Each structure stands twice: as structure tokens, then as C-alpha cells.
């Protein structure tokens, strides 16, 4: 029955980081979004394998062991918790090992996942565009977040697709996400992420999805697998609002440190502050002469000294003696 129903992508947009993928996985587990029941048929691939389409399938229920889409892809490269593939201009010849191009345009042989160059070029690698690759040989940071290290190692198709995959295990069952996008579509802001989708605003990944996975990088540190729209603002592309990135930006914004002056430093600062000398106005001292109260001379009343008078015993008149003032010159008797 599932094979007769038309196949639709689980989601249309762009998964920037691990958190975006976990939102889609959680939405599928909770019934907000739907797993795809099968792989696309050959007649459906042209309409389904295109930029923006994201497919999530559960390995046991769908019976899908390997996702196929009839596109020639480069070998995978790790970017955060994702695997990246880029569309090739033409497939590798049958039976030939996949060989990466060296910087001088020569091919290299892969053995055990390690590439060894056949020839090394001593001439500095040109900064121009490689044949079949629209990206410069030294990519910018925003291109690294979209194509990883798949820059000029193979003969990539111009305006080709990038495939981005990630897997989780929930209750012992593997779930896989396969995303397709065109680099220019992401740069132009044509593909929004699940964090911007109002339908998924209330979706919160369950604890088993956040902590129970064997991710290469912790979820909060897996920004190496994301594309930061703010990185392309300087080259004129519109940016997207990403709620989780905005939240992390607020959390990691540098705080302006206000140095607090230590008490001893404050004391020293107070000690070393120049003191403004305020001249004290000289107050003239007014000499107050001490007023000596006039001493009032109190004349002492002269007490007349009375001389004892001796009356003459016979006559009764005053008797004087010679030598005393007013003494008579002679005696009368």
C-alpha cells in the first residue's frame, strides 16, 4: 500500500546544526511530521531529489537499509555530527577507485580513507576557480559551513546539490535524516530552518535524543556542522533568524566587565588623591584694649586729732606748756 501512495518529503528547508535535526526527529516521533515509508521510485526522483527536501525514515518499519537517489556523489566528509556529500560532474568509472584531485590538478589515490598525492606541486595554488567547481580554492568560512572540506578535491558539478545526513537511535531503532540543498539557495535565504517554523515552535527534543546518542560532538558544541546565516551578511545575502542561535548568542555574549575597586585600592586611591589646598583667610585679630576701670580715689576723712587739754586747776582755762605751739611766752602765775 505504501508503494502506491505518492511520496512526499518529511520537511522542506535546511538543517543548520544538530539541534535542527533533533527537532525534526522529535516532530516525527511525536506525529507532527511523518517518516517516509520507502525510497523514491525512479520516476519520482527528478521531482523529489531537489534542493530543500528532507527525508526521515525509520530503518525497521521502512525496510530501507541504504538510501539511493541515482545521483553520483563524492566520498563523504565529516562536518560536526553530519556526513556531507557533493554532486559530481560525472560518476567514477566502474571498478576504479575514487581518486581525489591534488592541488595541482593531479589525481590522488585513496587507500583506507587516507589520500596520498602522486605529485606535489611547489608552485603556490592559484586563487581562482577550479574546473567544474564554482568555489574558490580557498573557501570562506560560510562556504566551509556548507560544503566542509569538499571544495576542490573532486570534479564537482556546477550548481550541483549537497547531501547532508545524520542518524540517531531511539529505543534500539535507527532513524536517518537525508537532506538536500543547493549552496546558492541557502546563501540567498530561500531555505529556512525548523527552528524558524511556527509549526515546530512547541517541539522540544526528548532527553533520549539529546543525551542518548553516540554523536561525535556534543549537541551544544556541534556548530561546526551548521551554517551561520550571519556569516554571509557582509557579502550582501539576506540572513535568517535562528531561535536557538539567538538564544546561544544571548548566553555567550561577552559581558562588559566593570572592574570593582578593591577596598585597599579604594583606600589607596583616596590616599593618593591630590588634596586641594584651601587657603584659610587670615582673620585680623582686633586688639581689644583692656579698659582699666578708673580707680575712684576715696579721700579718707581726716580725723582731727584732739589733744588732751589740761585745764588749769585753779583758773579753769587751758593750760599750755612751753615748747608747744601757741604756748604763751610767760606764765601767768
Curated annotation (Swiss-Prot):
Pfam families: Gti1_Pac2. Residues 93-139, 241-307 are annotated as: Disordered. Induction: Regulates its own expression in a negative feedback loop. Keywords: Activator, Nucleus, Transcription, Transcription regulation. It comes from the Eukaryota. GO terms for molecular function: DNA binding. InterPro entries: Gti1/Pac2. One of its GO terms (cellular component) is nucleus. It is found in: Nucleus. Belongs to the MIT1/WOR1 family. Global transcriptional regulator that acts as an activator of secondary metabolism. Required for expression of a yet uncharacterized secondary metabolism gene cluster containing a non-canonical non-ribosomal peptide synthetase. Not required for conidiogenesis nor for pathogenicity, but is involved in vegetative growth. PANTHER family: TRANSCRIPTIONAL REGULATOR MIT1 (PTHR28027:SF2). This is Global transcription regulator sge1. It comes from Gibberella fujikuroi (strain CBS 195.34 / IMI 58289 / NRRL A-6831). The lineage of its organism: Eukaryota, Fungi, Dikarya, Ascomycota, Pezizomycotina. The gene is sge1.
